[in-house]
Every structure is written in structure tokens, then in C-alpha cells.
């Protein structure tokens, strides 16, 4: 259990942060702010959210994409990170698990996730 003063401070930090609602299985496009010397630029990372863990300020999510030469790339982002410029949900996936770590072993069509039909 957290100290109530710490909890109040964390709540004030989270008030002005807004994130779209997403869950494991959704395809996301993340805009990541990168600072190189004096310049800043936005680099986009697109992949499937395979896990969300933690709560409050400590909440993180893991995004996986297949890069060049069929190499899987996973990045873990803090939910309320200052370096996240934008988060966009491209597809809503239909999965029955909260953690999709089994996708690490799948290749090609076996790694696909069904899309939610409206």
C-alpha cells in the first residue's frame, strides 16, 4: 500500500495525461520524440501490443513488430512517458489472453491476430 501523499502526487501527475484506450492484441502506431543534439524529431514505431503491466505511474506496455530480415523487435514504453508524442490505435485485435508472449514463437501467418468485426 502506498503512502497517501505519494498517491496524491501521482494522481496530480496523471491528470493532464491522456492516452487512447487499448489492450493487448491492438495494433498501435507510436510517435517517439528523439532528441539529437539541438534537433528533435518524431520517429514512428508500429506494432502489436503484447502486454500491459503495472498501474498508476508505473504502468508500462510492450509493443512488438517484425523488422527487417524477419527479426522481431520489442520495445517497452512507460504509459505516461514524456517521449511518447502520439499513440494511435490502428486495428483492434480479438484475443483471449492478456499477455501475448506466445507470438514470439510464431512466424508468418501464424503470428496474425484476428480483427474485431463491428
UniProtKB/Swiss-Prot annotation:
Keyword annotations from UniProtKB, A to Z: Ribonucleoprotein, Ribosomal protein
Any single GO CC term annotated in Swiss-Prot or TrEMBL for this entry: cytosolic large ribosomal subunit
One Gene Ontology MF term: structural constituent of ribosome
Biological processes annotated in GO: translation
Entry keyword annotation includes DNA damage: no
InterPro entries attached to this UniProt entry: Ribosomal_bL19, Ribosomal_bL19_CS, Ribosomal_bL19_sf, Translation_prot_SH3-like_sf
SUPFAM superfamilies for this protein: Translation proteins SH3-like domain
Keyword Protease among UniProt keywords: no
Matches recorded under PANTHER family: LARGE RIBOSOMAL SUBUNIT PROTEIN BL19M (PTHR15680:SF9), RIBOSOMAL PROTEIN L19 (PTHR15680)
Role of this protein: This protein is located at the 30S-50S ribosomal subunit interface and may play a role in the structure and function of the aminoacyl-tRNA binding site.
Similarity field: Belongs to the bacterial ribosomal protein bL19 family.
Designated name of the protein: Large ribosomal subunit protein bL19
Source species: Helicobacter pylori (strain G27)
Gene assigned in the entry: rplS
Amino acid at each position: 500500500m502506498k503512502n497517501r501523499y505519494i498517491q496524491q502526487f501521482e494522481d496530480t501527475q496523471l491528470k493532464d495525461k491522456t492516452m487512447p484506450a487499448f489492450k493487448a492484441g491492438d495494433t498501435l502506431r507510436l510517435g517517439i520524440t528523439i532528441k539529437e543534439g539541438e534537433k528533435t524529431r518524431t520517429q514512428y514505431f508500429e506494432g502489436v501490443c503484447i502486454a500491459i503491466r503495472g498501474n498508476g505511474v508505473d504502468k508500462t506496455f510492450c509493443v512488438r513488430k517484425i523488422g527487417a530480415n524477419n527479426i522481431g523487435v520489442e520495445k517497452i514504453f512507460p504509459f505516461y512517458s514524456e517521449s511518447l508524442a502520439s499513440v494511435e490505435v490502428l486495428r483492434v485485435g480479438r484475443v483471449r489472453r492478456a499477455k501475448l508472449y506466445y507470438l514470439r514463437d510464431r512466424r508468418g501467418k501464424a503470428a496474425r491476430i484476428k480483427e474485431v468485426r463491428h
